[in-house]
Amino acid sequence: MSVSRETERLATYAGLLRKWNPAINLIAASTIDQIEARHIADSLHLVEIAKNAQGSWVDLGSGGGLPGIVVAIMRPDLELSMVESDQRKGAFLRNAIRELALPHAKVLCKRIEALDRLDAANLSARALAPLPQLMAYVERHLSPSGTAWLMKGRNWQAEVSQAQSDWKFDLKTHQSATDPDAAILEITGLRHA
């Protein structure tokens, strides 16, 4: 895929977010002017960090498609499933997949805990839940040999400490490209403590 095609798709996606956001609150209204500089840039940073990822990719709590749609645009070689229980947001994601011609992306419109195990090689989540709660979802849907890519805000260190009381895991942290206090957590070897 050419860089210009990817850039065009990202611009189209940003336009879709702006168009649909007033009706279904895909991203905070206060950050609508930061779609490219914050939301898409965060997701592109994840794609860069996970550039060697292979196999299936599951994005939990996809909402407006961050990072799921961006991963699908930049990594069309991956089979990507976006899990979103809100039917309206699921409709947005399906529309985005259609308009952006992303044949390897699909939407699972169910609650995370109601899905059969997905056994993902890669799993992402952004702004979904505190890490201690998120770990149960990750453990359910990530392959034992898989990697979780969790985008966390300013409290990520406290969340990691809390999660370590119930879980053991290998952790590599990557500073966010858009917020020096935020991080992308690369988690492998997840198991109960």
From Swiss-Prot:
Classification via InterPro entries: rRNA_ssu_MeTfrase_G (IPR003682), SAM-dependent_MTases_sf (IPR029063)
Entry binding sites for S-adenosyl-L-methionine: 61, 66, 112-113, 126
UniProt entry tagged with the keyword Transferase: yes
Annotated SUPFAM superfamilies: S-adenosyl-L-methionine-dependent methyltransferases
Pfam families per the UniProt record, alphabetical: GidB (PF02527)
UniProt EC number: 2.1.1.170
Keywords annotated in UniProt: Cytoplasm, Methyltransferase, rRNA processing, S-adenosyl-L-methionine, Transferase
Record field: catalytic activity: guanosine(527) in 16S rRNA + S-adenosyl-L-methionine = N(7)-methylguanosine(527) in 16S rRNA + S-adenosyl-L-homocysteine
Family indicated by similarity: Belongs to the methyltransferase superfamily. RNA methyltransferase RsmG family.
Function: Specifically methylates the N7 position of guanine in position 527 of 16S rRNA.
Protein name, per record: Ribosomal RNA small subunit methyltransferase G
Gene encoding the protein: rsmG
